[in-house]
Structure formats: C-alpha cells, structure tokens
Amino acid sequence: MTMEVVLIAVVVSVACALCGVFLVLRRISLMSDAISHSVILGIVLGYFLSRTLSSFVPFVGAVIAGICSVICAELLQKTGMVKSDAAVGLVFPAMFGLGVILVSLYAGNVHLDTDAVLLGEIGLAPLDRVSFFAWSLPRSLVQMGSVLCGLLLLLALFFKELKISTFDPVLATSLGFSPTLINYGLMLAVSITCVGAFDSVGAVLVIALMITPPAAALLLTDNLLLMLVLASLLASCASISGLFLAVKIDGSIAGAMATMAGVLFALVYLFSPKHGVVRRCLVMRALKLDLDVVTLAVHLATHRYTVERSVECAEVHLTEHVSWSARRAARVVRTALRRGMVERHGALLLLTAQGVSLAQARLDVSV
C-alpha cells in the first residue's frame, strides 16, 4: 500500500509540475490557486445535476468552474481597473466561498468535506480502487495516470506552439498560431489536472506542486525541455521525501510534502550554480576584489614618481590613504601579488609592467 501511495504522489507531482512550468514562465502562477479553489463550486453544481459524486458530471462541472475562474479573472484584468494578481484574488475567494455556502446549505449530507478538498488525504487514496485491465488499482492512480499521459501527449504534439506563445506571443501570431487559444488550452489542462489531483492531495498541495518545483527548475536552467524534466524530478523528490517525513513524524502528508517542496526550493535558491544566492555572493565578492585591485593599481600609479611615494606606496599606509581596513588591504595586496600586478621592494609596493598596463587600460592614468 505504501508503494501505491508513492506512485500516486509521483504521478500527481509530475502532472502538476508539467503544467506549472508554463504558468511560472507566463507569470500567472496564482492562476493555479484560482482554479484549484474554484473547483468545489463546480463539484457542488455537478452534484445538484447528477445527485451523485461518483458520476462524471461533477468532474466536468469542476473543470468548467476552473475555466470560468480564468475567464472572469481575465475579464476583470481587461477592464484596466484591477491588475492581474488582484483579479485572481477577487475571483477565486468568491467562487470558493459560494461553493462552501452551497455545500453547507444544500449538501450537508453529502460526502464532500471542504477540509478534504483543501488538504486531501493521499494516505487513504489506495482504498478507493477500480478494476483496470483485470488489475485492481487505486482510482486516483488510474485517474491521474490518464491525466499525465494526456499532458505528455499534448506536450509532444504542441511543444513548439506552447514554447513560442509563452516567450513571444507576437511571433506566435505572425506564424499563424493563436496565443489566446493556446492559453485557454493550457488553462483547460491545468483545470483538469487540478480537478484530478485535488481528490488525492488537496488544493493546497496542488498549488505547492505547480509553483515550487517549476520555480526551482527556473533557477537551474534556461532550457525549456530541461526545465520540464527538472521540475518533474524536483516535484517527485518533494513528494516522496515528504511522504516518508510524514510517516516518520506521524504528521500531515500534504503538509510534509509542501514543506519538502519549500526545502528543495530553498536549497536551489541558495546553491543554484547560475542564479543561487551563494553563487551571486561569490561573484560579487570577486568583482569587488577585482575593483580593489584596480584601485590599488591606480593609487600606486598615481604616486609612482611623486615625493610622497615612500608613504603613499607603503603597504602599511594603505588603510589611511585608500580607506581600507587592515584585513581588506592585506587581501587586496595578496591578490595583486598573486596576479603579478605589484612587487614588494622593502616596505614599498611597486607596479609591474602588467600593473601599469592595468592602470592605463582601466582608468587611462598617465604613468
């Protein structure tokens, strides 16, 4: 049963991550929030029509509700009176709140719990089983497996169109593609994924899996195909590690998965080879050291033939004349010596030919 839970978690994670990459790149990540919270209204309305949650009608209603939330948010944005993030924030609470009211008033005896919709319970997902080609499989695994296969098929067929419309809608239009149609197709795929996943992992975890792994993958690569692969791997790692963490601490599985997704993002944010905080700090430190070496070369070149050379070019006086701390001055001198920019002559620091060239090239100092 644990293996089935792991499989469900991986399938859901990969499906959410694939959709999330395009949401992150299009800067509409919160649209997943709007869709995942709006589905409860569609489920309730679908139940009113079919009088059962086991039919296909609530699923279709949830997908339609997700698309309606996207359309309403875009219509609000096009008025020019509210921005895109505010439009999303206006639409989904209203639809979610209306769904909760309808559940409490007219569907109180229905097995539809708002806590389960938000948080899910993936640990119990294998208990709901269906027969699939003579195999007894968890319904969630079959459902999300079908969604994932559909997403992979759509990516294979329309990868070029999605890529061009995401990065350059004007070029897509000139090539005969419809960015609007592609956008609504993407939103339909996101809606189906959210509806399929919320029953297993809940709306909150769907949001975390759609935003966090793709955002981390974006810090690791600029290649779209590689980004899709990395986002899927990161989402799978977050789900698996979160699942075992929840078992270890006997806590919420959805909460542990979301936490591990955040931990993985934090690690990538800190240690990404290209965009990580540590990398940027090291680059800034190196640039600052390069600038200090140039400053030292200019200072020594300026006073090379002056009567104050014995003072201005003395290493012990750098803290006074260049306003450096003793530690910083020592580090700059070590670097300049290692690079062959200066030489020690007793207590003095004198420029080498390479140091003179550096001063002339960078600041046009006449020496």
Curated annotation (Swiss-Prot):
Q: Which Gene3D superfamilies match?
A: ABC transporter involved in vitamin B12 uptake, BtuC
GO annotations of cellular component type:
ATP-binding cassette (ABC) transporter complex
Q: Which residues cross the membrane?
A: 5-25, 28-48, 56-76, 87-107, 140-160, 170-190, 201-221, 224-244, 251-271
Q: Which UniProt keywords apply?
A: Cell membrane, Ion transport, Membrane, Transmembrane, Transmembrane helix, Transport, Zinc, Zinc transport
**Which superkingdom is the protein from?**
Bacteria
Q: Which residues form a coiled coil?
A: none
Instruction: Spell out the PANTHER family in the cross-references.
Output: ABC-TRANSPORTER METAL-BINDING PROTEIN (PTHR30477), METAL TRANSPORT SYSTEM MEMBRANE PROTEIN CT_070-RELATED (PTHR30477:SF8)
Q: Which InterPro entries match?
A: ABC_BtuC-like (IPR037294), ABC_TroCD (IPR001626)
Q: What does this protein do?
A: Part of an ATP-driven transport system TroABCD for zinc.
This chain's protein is named Zinc transport system membrane protein TroD
A biological process (GO) annotation for this entry?
transmembrane transport
The record's listing under Pfam families reads:
ABC-3
